[in-house]
């Protein structure tokens, strides 16, 4: 990614959904759980592993996979220079799109640590929907409009690249839903 694309991820597409998650109403089962220990940290090792190792793995694979798919689908071979070409701009746009698609899935997965994303009421947080609409509008602006392409150094991403990235996002969603299911069953077994 270029510097301006990284800034678009950090300041444009990632910030608003993260802030909207902060307005998420508490889990309905929160009062059924025992209180947290006084010495327990808010950001503990389990949370860090879930965010950066487990979910982060899927996000970190989706982005470069989109990049290399665009290159290889166009006949690129290792060692060929592609910087500042239309192919390179499309590949970085696919990378950007992979990051944003994974962020959208991640927002729904992070609404609850243990409750399935399918069980959390969809319309419960209007700020989240506004943030996601803004994030997707920014993605469309950067990838599909001439001013966005000129400003961010991108090119339109072909349908094949979107379809190639999608299984990584669906895989992340499925893996986290499976982790939540196991966590719920372990909680009931205690």
Could you describe each region identified by the protein language model?
Residues 1-190:
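C-terminal transmembrane helices and immediately adjacent loops/tails
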């Amino acid at each position: 990614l270029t510097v301006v694309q990284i800034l678009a991820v950090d300041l444009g597409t990632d910030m608003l959904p993260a802030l909207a998650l902060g307005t998420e109403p508490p889990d309905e089962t929160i009062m059924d759980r025992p209180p947290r220990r006084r010495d327990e940290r808010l950001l503990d090792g389990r949370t860090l592993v879930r965010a950066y190792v487990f979910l982060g793995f899927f996000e970190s694979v989706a982005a470069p996979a989109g990049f290399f798919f665009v290159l290889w689908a166009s006949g690129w071979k290792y060692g060929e220079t592609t910087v500042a070409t239309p192919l390179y701009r499309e590949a970085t746009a696919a990378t950007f799109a992979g990051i944003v698609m994974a962020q959208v899935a991640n927002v729904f997965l992070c609404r609850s640590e243990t409750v399935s994303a399918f069980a959390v009421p969809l319309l419960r947080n209007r700020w989240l929907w506004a943030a996601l609409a803004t994030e997707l509008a920014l993605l469309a602006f950067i990838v599909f409009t001439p001013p966005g392409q000129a400003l961010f150094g991108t090119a339109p991403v072909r349908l094949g690249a979107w379809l190639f990235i999608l299984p990584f996002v669906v895989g992340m969603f499925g893996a986290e839903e499976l982790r939540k299911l196991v966590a719920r069953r372990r909680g009931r077994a205690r």
